[in-house]
Amino acid sequence: MPPKFDPNEIKVVYLRCTGGEVGATSALAPKIGPLGLSPKKVGDDIAKATGDWKGLRITVKLTIQNRQAQIEVVPSASALIIKALKEPPRDRKKQKNIKHNGNITFDEIVNIARQMRHRSLARELSGTIKEILGTAQSVGCNVDGRHPHDIIDDINSGAVECPAS
C-alpha cells in the first residue's frame, strides 16, 4: 500500500508547455495523477495562466498543496526577448525554427536582465545583461539596430555603461 497522503505536503512540478494551449493531458497524467489532481482541469488552468505567452515555449511551475495547484509561469530569457519583440503569434505547426529579425532597445534588455537576475550565475548585473544579449543574438534580433555581440564588446571596453543594479 502507498504511504498515507499528507495534506500539508507541498509538491513542486515543473512542466514545459506552449503558451495558451492545453498540452496533451496524457503527458500530465503520470506526473500529477498520483497527487490527486485531475489532469484535464490542470491543463485548462495552465492554458488560462499562459494566455499572454501565446505560441511560445515556456516553463510552468506547479505548486501542489492539499490537492490544490498554484500555477506560476517561469519564462526563459528567449521567451522574454521574443515577447519584447512584439511579433504577432505564429502557428507553430506551420513554421519551424523561426529566425526573428526584430529590433529591441537596450533598456528592454536591461529590464529583462533584472527579471532574470535571480536565476543568473553572473556576479553583477552587467554580466546578466551580457547573458541576455547572447540570448538575443541566438534568437536573431538586433539591439538598438546593432548586432548584440557588438554591444557586448562595447560593455567590455567600457564604451557602454551598464546600470549598477
From Swiss-Prot:
One Pfam family in the UniProt entry: Ribosomal_L11_N
Signal peptide: none
Domain of life: Eukaryota
Record-level GO BP terms: positive regulation of translational elongation; translation
Functional note: Component of the large ribosomal subunit. The ribosome is a large ribonucleoprotein complex responsible for the synthesis of proteins in the cell. Binds directly to 26S ribosomal RNA.
Subunit structure, as described in the record: Component of the large ribosomal subunit. Mature ribosomes consist of a small (40S) and a large (60S) subunit. The 40S subunit contains about 33 different proteins and 1 molecule of RNA (18S). The 60S subunit contains about 49 different proteins and 3 molecules of RNA (28S, 5.8S and 5S).
Family of the protein in this entry: Belongs to the universal ribosomal protein uL11 family.
Protein name as it appears in the record: Large ribosomal subunit protein uL11
Lineage of the species this protein comes from: Eukaryota, Metazoa, Chordata, Craniata, Vertebrata
Gene (UniProt): Rpl12
